[in-house]
Amino acid sequence: MAAATRGCRPWGSLLGLLGLVSAAAAAWDLASLRCTLGAFCECDFRPDLPGLECDLAQHLAGQHLAKALVVKALKAFVRDPAPTKPLVLSLHGWTGTGKSYVSSLLAHYLFQGGLRSPRVHHFSPVLHFPHPSHIERYKKDLKSWVQGNLTACGRSLFLFDEMDKMPPGLMEVLRPFLGSSWVVYGTNYRKAIFIFISNTGGKQINQVALEAWRSRRDREEILLQELEPVISRAVLDNPHHGFSNSGIMEERLLDAVVPFLPLQRHHVRHCVLNELAQLGLEPRDEVVQAVLDSTTFFPEDEQLFSSNGCKTVASRIAFFL
């Protein structure tokens, strides 16, 4: 999916994941100290909610629930000068449906430096927590990193990708940071944002969307109330999910479970047109059709949903140009 700058204009490719180091204190400086002590200091937190809303409307295909939930949650959180707890969102859905895209947009439209901001922290289990046998060290390092950076600046964003692959038990150390009473050394952690991303629940979301289509219901009629229980059950029943045995879901520390619906052919077409525009190219029917023809759809009988969402659109366009 194409991305956009502040003001909802096209922008360049996103940076890779930020590295994790074990001692966050080494990154602190006098500016961070002043930020900690200043009651009104927001570091480089510069929210542009109209820009975010515009970008989601133009570029996020087929996700009426995700758009509404994310915008509503952020508006309420950002406009509250004294939130009662951090904002905690859990994004769920099939591959290529826009979860990582939305999380990158949040970083871009909330912080002046986007993903480059020192207040945005992106964690991947493959890069940062690859060895389950090192779980105790990972716990210590993660807790130190989160606590240290929140002490430096309460306005911080923590992105946890591929929760399906997180070492079991690791997320337990985050539980104290996600509630409404975690204050350490005079620093209030309630202005932080935590976002968790996973494919868990994707099959269940797909099934609900398929049943709606078979019943001739418009996909925009699908309600959160239909999806939230099946997603929560899928997470709780998965012993390999990062939330397993963490108490995060059981204690209702999530502010919103955000479902991403599977993408149909016209949604993939939308992604192709967006990507061509991102490349500065005019839409070419033969390229659009070639990408659609090379995309696998499921179920076998209906051929309704893209197997990879829009994940491979950019590489397919490059092949057919």
From Swiss-Prot:
Similarity-based family: Belongs to the ClpA/ClpB family. Torsin subfamily.
Carbohydrate attachment residues: N149
Cellular component terms (Gene Ontology): endoplasmic reticulum lumen; nuclear envelope
Identification of the protein by name: Torsin-2A
UniProt main location, coarse: endoplasmic reticulum
Organs and tissues of expression: Isoform 1 is expressed ubiquitously, except in cardiac and endothelial tissues.
Keywords from the named record: ATP-binding, Endoplasmic reticulum, Glycoprotein, Nucleotide-binding, Signal
Native source species: Homo sapiens (Human)
NAD in keyword set: no
Compartments (UniProt record): Endoplasmic reticulum lumen
Residue ranges that the Swiss-Prot or TrEMBL entry lists as coiled coil: none
Record GO biological process: chaperone cofactor-dependent protein refolding
Quaternary structure, from the entry: Homohexamer. Interacts with TOR1AIP1.
MF terms in GO: ATP binding; ATP hydrolysis activity; identical protein binding
